[in-house]
Every structure is written in structure tokens, then in C-alpha cells.
């Protein structure tokens, strides 16, 4: 089953269509996942502070999947001024091991550096 999911992730850029995620200025968190992996959605992302939060479904936004080299979902990427600063990826079971506290600490570190 995991092999099938991995194959689906790799094939999505070929068979899907794009909504094109836009990563802009400032401190942003993008939570990449896929509709077929909603059971492993990272619910706590919405609780992060001092940043803009975006969601991206790689099943429908295959350009973003390719551009940001998403190979496993969920993946959380912290962007600052459009540049990737930190990436948190799920393990082989498609479960996120990073915690709200860990990601918030990194956000606070970056947010503090901007002042």
C-alpha cells in the first residue's frame, strides 16, 4: 500500500492539473498534503502564530509539488521572504513527527531575527 501511495505521488505531476501555489513575502508556513492522505493531516498547523499559513493539496496543484520537490506528505515548509528556511517531512508511514512546539520555535526564531 505504501508503495502505491509513493507511486501516486510521483505520477501526480504527469496526470494532474495545476492551481499554482504562490509563496509571497514575509514569513509563511505551507502545509503540503493530498486529499487521499487526509487521515494524516497536520491539524495543529492552524495554531501557529506570527506567520501566514497556506494549505496545498498536491493532488490538484502538481506544479507546486514539483517546484518544491514534495516527495512525501504531509510536508511543512517554512518560507521567509519567498525562500525555504526549514522543511519538516512525514516518515514512511505518512505521519508527521514534528510537533507544534518545534515548528513554532523555529518560526519564533525567524520572526525575532527580522526585527
Please give the residue ranges for each predicted region.
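Bacterial Sec-dependent N-terminal signal peptides
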Residues: 1-21
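Extracytoplasmic/periplasmic, Sec-exported soluble proteins
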Residues: 57, 68, 95-99
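Structural micro-motif
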Residues: 68-80
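Residue-level detector of flexible, active-site-proximal loop/helix-junction positions
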Residues: 36, 60, 92
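Non-catalytic, surface beta->alpha helical segment in thiol-disulfide oxidoreductase systems
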Residues: 78-115
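A short beta-strand-loop structural module common to alpha/beta enzyme folds
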Residues: 52-60
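Local sequence-structure signature of Cys/Sec-based thiol-disulfide redox active-site neighborhoods
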Residues: 19-52
Amino acid at each position: 500500500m505504501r508503495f502505491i501511495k509513493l507511486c501516486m505521488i510521483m505520477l501526480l505531476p504527469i496526470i494532474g492539473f495545476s492551481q499554482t501555489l504562490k509563496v509571497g513575502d514575509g514569513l509563511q508556513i505551507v502545509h503540503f498534503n493530498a486529499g487521499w492522505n487526509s487521515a494524516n493531516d497536520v491539524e495543529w498547523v492552524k495554531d501557529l502564530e506570527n506567520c501566514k499559513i497556506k494549505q496545498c493539496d498536491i493532488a490538484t496543484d502538481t506544479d507546486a509539488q514539483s517546484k518544491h520537490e514534495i516527495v512525501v506528505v504531509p510536508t511543512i515548509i517554512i518560507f521567509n521572504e519567498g525562500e525555504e528556511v526549514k522543511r519538516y517531512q512525514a516518515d514512511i508511514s505518512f505521519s508527521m513527527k514534528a510537533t507544534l512546539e518545534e515548528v513554532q520555535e523555529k518560526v519564533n526564531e525567524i520572526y525575532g531575527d527580522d526585527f
